[in-house]
Regions:
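Active-site regions of metal-assisted phosphoester/phosphodiester hydrolases
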Residues: 1-34, 42-43, 58-59, 63-67, ...
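Short, flexible/disordered intra-domain loops and linkers
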Residues: 44-50
Length: 236
């Protein structure tokens, strides 16, 4: 199974143009079974989606997981999950991550075999620590194969993720920010130990370098006790 994460910056590219179609082109090229998005909704008012649902339906093979609390948003606190048509969603959860800088996470169960969690953590490390503690506490209440993906906002390659504890193994697909000259591994993946990581990567193309300020990252996974629903491609 191939799972990807992409901070789309509300579909505003490095050229300062808001271009949802450009983001959808990137998503199509990922060829992923599941894509976790950050900054998928605008910040003001009812937080309307930066990717119009009709465009998603007409121009991709993805279906949004039902995470929004209204008719105009795509996700929760800007976190959204898209799944390929035909991939069964067996559960959805919105998770509050309070503290001074309120954030949220989303959890989507795929075919009862994998829980995909999307996060966009705070800018300050002490807030991130609190958010990770809360997230780990909630997730460990019900054990199942789990992949946490998103913008962890952690610049250090060796610290800052201690609150994940021993339940998760952290993977960094590579530098993904900023797109002009990627140096920071902000976009990461944490897996429970019952999931095998087959491959990982960062998608750097002419399109991804301008479509957002983050590059998409992806992982190819083997789930426990069963073959993945379809053969995952090894590239981005």
């Amino acid at each position: 199974m191939k799972v990807a994460s992409y901070n789309i910056r509300k579909a505003v590219g490095r050229d300062r143009r808001r271009d949802p179609a450009r983001i959808l082109d990137v998503l199509n090229a990922l060829d992923a079974d599941v894509v976790v998005l950050q900054e998928a909704d605008k910040r003001l008012g009812q937080r309307p989606s930066a990717l119009p649902p009709r465009m998603i339906a007409d121009h991709t093979d993805f279906v949004p997981a039902p995470l929004a609390v209204n008719d105009v948003s795509l996700g929760w606190h800007g976190n959204a999950v898209l799944v390929k048509r035909g991939v069964e969603i067996t559960g959805c959860t919105r998770i509050d991550l309070p503290f001074f800088e309120p954030r949220g996470a989303v959890a989507v169960e795929i075919e009862g075999r994998l829980r995909v969690v999307g996060v966009h953590l705070g800018l300050l490390r002490r807030h991130r620590h609190g958010q990770l503690r809360q997230l780990r506490r909630i997730l460990t209440e019900r054990a199942m194969p789990t992949a946490i993906l998103g913008d962890f906002n952690e610049w250090s390659k060796i610290g800052g993720m201690e609150e994940l504890g021993a339940d998760f193994h952290l993977h960094m697909p590579g530098p993904s920010f900023p797109t002009m000259r990627p140096t920071a591994m902000l976009d990461r993946v944490a897996l429970t130990h019952d999931i095998d990581l087959r491959d990982k990567g960062v998608v750097m193309t002419e399109l991804t370098r301008i479509a957002s300020d983050h590059l998409p990252v992806w992982v190819s996974l083997t789930l426990p006790d069963a073959a993945a629903p379809r053969a995952a491609s090894a590239g981005g």
